Structures are given as C-alpha cells and as structure tokens.
Amino acid sequence: YFGKVYRKETMHKGRSSEFFQGGVELMNKPGLQGDKEVMTMIQESLPGISLKNILLELGSAKFYNRLLELVGNQRNELEDILRLRDISEMKRFVSKNDFEESLNQLLLSLPTCFGNIDLLHQMMDKCQDSVLLGALQELKDLYESLDSKEKIIFDLGMVPTMKYYTGFMIKGYSD
C-alpha cells in the first residue's frame, strides 16, 4: 500500500502532519528470504512513483529493542534522546549511568550512527553483545543479498514508529 497519512505532530510545531507512507505485508516467508523479497519489491516499485533521487535507509528494531533492554529502567530517556538525536543529552545520559564501557561507547555513537556498509562493519567490530551483533549481521546479510546496493544507507539510531516492529526497518527519502 502507498498513500497519504495524517499524524498529529506535537513535538515539531509548524511541521506538516501530512506525509506519504508505504507498507508491505509479507506472510509465510520469514527471515532473510522474506526480507530480501520485500526489499527487492520496494526497489523495483520506486521508479513507478515519480520520485527523484531516492535514498533507502535501513535500521533494525531488534537492535533498538536490545538497546532498551540493556539500559533497563532508563529506556524511556534513551528513546527520547535517540528520537531527537541529541548528542549532548546522550553524553549526559551515559555519564550519569553505570553502564559497561562498551555500551557507553556504542550509545555515544548512536545519534550520528548512519552511513554506508563501512559504518555497519565498524559497528560490528565494536559490538560486544551477541543480540546486538546478531541484529547487525542480519542487516549485513540483507544488504549483501540484494542485487541493487546503490542508494542504501544504514541508521543504527533509528527509532521504530510502532512498538510491534521486530526486524529490519526502512525509510525512504527523496528530493
């Protein structure tokens, strides 16, 4: 599906409450096979919707949800910081909590943690948590399975817009 969506905007006054949203429902094809089918369908459909210079941004709800588990009762604050991509608040958040150093370094990188496949490789090298690493590996596997890799970036600080998201997430941007 693809169409106009209207959402009440409380945080950004003056921001349009109308935007376009597309979605795909895929059943009975779990894991990489299903994710690849969805991505391929999206990539093949985009030229038909008259948008120019489309960039696809991939994130992981599994990665995000694990971060929330790791920060425990500080999850709401982390969610707000990531949603706003507030670097100074993230520094304050890390300094006031007693997380492991590897988690601190990961958290500090998240507000600006978006880029190409090289960024994903760098983050995989830094990740110490097996669930986080598994989520990053799933993104890497998806990327490597695609025939068309151009105009795909990763955003590891992406916040799911719906609580029920569990796997990869995608946002599209156009001129």
Describe every region a protein language model picked out.
Residues E18-G22, L58-R66:
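Short, conserved phosphate-binding/catalytic loop or strand-edge motifs used
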Residues N65-R75, Y164-I170:
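Short glycine/threonine-rich loop-to-helix capping motif typified by GTGT followed
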Residues M41-P47, K62-G72:
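Hydrophobic mid-domain F-helix/FG-region of cytochrome P450s
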